A protein has these predicted regions:
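Hydrophobic positions on the alpha1 helix immediately C-terminal to the Walker A/P-loop
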Residues: 38
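Post-Walker A helix-loop "phosphate-sensing" segment adjacent to the P-loop in P-loop NTPases
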Residues: 44-53
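Hydrophobic anchor at the beta1->P-loop junction of P-loop NTPases
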Residues: 27
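A glycine- and Lys/Arg-enriched "phosphate-lid" helix/loop adjacent to the NTP-binding pocket
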Residues: 111-164
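The conserved Walker
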Residues: 31
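Conserved nucleotide-sensing/catalytic segment adjacent to the nucleotide-binding pocket
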Residues: 53-55, 60-106
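NTP-dependent small-molecule kinase module
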Residues: 20, 45, 155-207
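Conserved lysine of the Walker
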Residues: 35
Length: 207
């Protein structure tokens, strides 16, 4: 598998099968809901590039490209979504339109707040314990000392939950997604069926 340093693109091991459908899937949802985990699985099952907007944004020492150089952030995202087949996850209003304009499918992970909070706390705890580098080449890790920061994923997920839910409900009705297939997943137990349906579409099979 070919990768780039601080890679926001993960390329498939092999070209798509003859007869398979080229898909561009946008995975949306609030912080900590599990977008990246799902997006990686979908990229593998549909043989598509994986685009992680957080990996494009966060530079070394937690410097945000989307804030420091919005034009460059936009350019990099545009270059990524110009590809023929991808799965993209992330919440960045400044590039939302260029992602959604190319999306053939949208998956909204709309779980209940307790589910999301459990997931984001568990994830942050594990990251802080292991000191795992979040994106290769950045040196960025999570620390317990940052848990009370306003921008930390735990606080961010809690503070923005209601606002994000309303935004996404409105977004799915937007004209830019009129031709896209949309999936709203309200419980983790329903996710397998959505993944199966998308994999079948990729393979050109009937659901």
């Amino acid at each position: 598998m070919r990768k780039q340093a601080n890679s926001h693109l993960d390329y498939p091991r092999a070209p798509c099968k003859t007869g398979s459908i080229r898909m561009r899937i946008a995975v949306i949802g609030t912080s900590g809901v599990g977008k990246s985990t799902l997006a990686r699985r979908l990229a593998a099952s549909t043989q598509a590039a994986y685009i992680e907007l957080d990996a494009i944004n966060w530079q070394a020492e937690w410097k945000p490209l989307a804030t420091d150089d919005p034009a460059e952030f936009y350019r990099r995202v545009q270059a990524a979504v110009d590809g023929p087949s991808w799965v993209c996850d992330g919440n960045y209003p400044g590039v939302r339109d260029i992602v959604l304009a190319r999306a053939t499918h949208v998956v909204w992970l709309d779980y209940a707040r307790p589910v999301i909070m459990w997931r984001v706390i568990r994830r942050s705890f594990w990251r802080a314990i292991t000191k795992a580098e979040l994106w290769p080449g950045t040196g960025n890790t999570e620390a317990f000392s940052a848990w009370l920061d306003k921008g930390h994923p735990i606080r961010w997920a809690w503070d923005t939950f209601a606002q994000r839910r309303a935004q996404y409900a409105h977004l799915l009705e937007a004209p830019i997604l009129a031709a896209a297939q949309k999936y709203r997943v309200t419980h983790p137990r329903d996710l397998a069926a959505v993944e199966s349906a998308l994999a079948q579409q990729h393979n050109g099979a009937s659901a």
